[in-house]
């Protein structure tokens, strides 16, 4: 009998083992769809970004005008720009849901996969930040000023580091040029890290909602999950199209329609919505260095989750106490997102401080204690 080329060809064999004949747990739910959705988001962002880069000018005198030119004069430029800007929002929605799935079902116990995932998240956040600076509107300029200035809080090297990143003594043309370079480069680095993420995942195989081993009950990825994932693709594309065509500026800041002016500070400097939870944590600490550390650890704390896992069970499916804590953490993060978009005044300051303390408490104290308590109750 002739052997199938997809199983013998050196390149096709890799694709086959990753996407076609991959043994997949039969019971994985729609929450396992977000990995492939993120892959699609990355491809959409790279393609739309590539076409935008063909018409964009990385120069402070013409950056803002070049974005206006793309939207007005380039064929379907408005559509490409709207898909790229709103695609970033859809990307982060999928990222946060993907992480939440990992936390809920204990996927973080695949340590290598989880750790490389956290690195991908950090790289995505840097990519989105430098990309937000490129239109050179008011919020682009002042957002870049505020966030890069945070590095000056680092002892001894801070000021030198900030000037090195700026390429001068203030945010100027050199800064915009290098930010454009980084924004172009990082998505390809992200794609490479995604391959490593998948490599580590396929070493252990996917987790499943029960958190139990699924070696006795696996089915091929194609056709079952290729078609299941296609449903997710269509839903995501529908939502993205809806956003890009009907309310393209819903998630934008109106301040960014004003060209950057170093002499005029906007009333409220804030990042895009997907960074507001971390921004709220940053602002809730009165000390500059303390705020920067809290900001960094709000993401890096994910690296501690596998170490602080105390339960005998992997998933939260059969752990009602930790389930309640998980949904409280989700609510807490939503509250932080809301606070991040509010002005720095009472009662928002106090709410932000309480929400920041509880955010870290969930990871460092409450989840480990709940896991230990549930173990005790299992022994009753």
UniProtKB/Swiss-Prot annotation:
One record GO biological process: mitochondrial electron transport, ubiquinol to cytochrome c
For this record, the Gene Ontology CC terms, alphabetical, are: mitochondrial inner membrane; respiratory chain complex III
How is the co-factor bound, per the entry? Binds 2 heme b groups non-covalently.
Q: Which InterPro entries match?
A: Cyt_b/b6_C, Cyt_b/b6_C_sf, Cyt_b/b6_N, Cytb/b6-like_sf, Cytochrome_b, Cytochrome_b_C_euk/bac, Cytochrome_b_N_euk/bac, Di-haem_cyt_TM
**Membrane topology (UniProt):** Multi-pass membrane protein
GO MF annotation list? metal ion binding; ubiquinol-cytochrome-c reductase activity
One Pfam family name from the record?
Cytochrome_B
Q: Which keywords accompany this UniProt record?
A: Electron transport, Heme, Iron, Membrane, Metal-binding, Mitochondrion, Mitochondrion inner membrane, Respiratory chain, Transmembrane, Transmembrane helix, Transport, Ubiquinone
List positions binding a ubiquinone.
Answer: 202
Cofactor names from the entry are: heme b
PROSITE patterns noted in UniProt: CYTB_CTER (PS51003), CYTB_NTER (PS51002)
Which residues does the record give as heme b b562 binding sites?
84, 183
TM annotation in the entry:
34-54, 78-99, 114-134, 179-199, 227-247, 289-309, 321-341, 348-368
Q: Is the Repeat keyword given for this protein?
A: no
Subunit structure and binding partners: The cytochrome bc1 complex contains 3 respiratory subunits (MT-CYB, CYC1 and UQCRFS1), 2 core proteins (UQCRC1 and UQCRC2) and probably 6 low-molecular weight proteins.
Q: Which family does it belong to?
A: Belongs to the cytochrome b family.
The record, for PANTHER family, names: CYTOCHROME B
Comment field (misc): Heme 1 (or BL or b562) is low-potential and absorbs at about 562 nm, and heme 2 (or BH or b566) is high-potential and absorbs at about 566 nm.
Its protein name is Cytochrome b
Q: Which gene encodes it?
A: mt-cyb
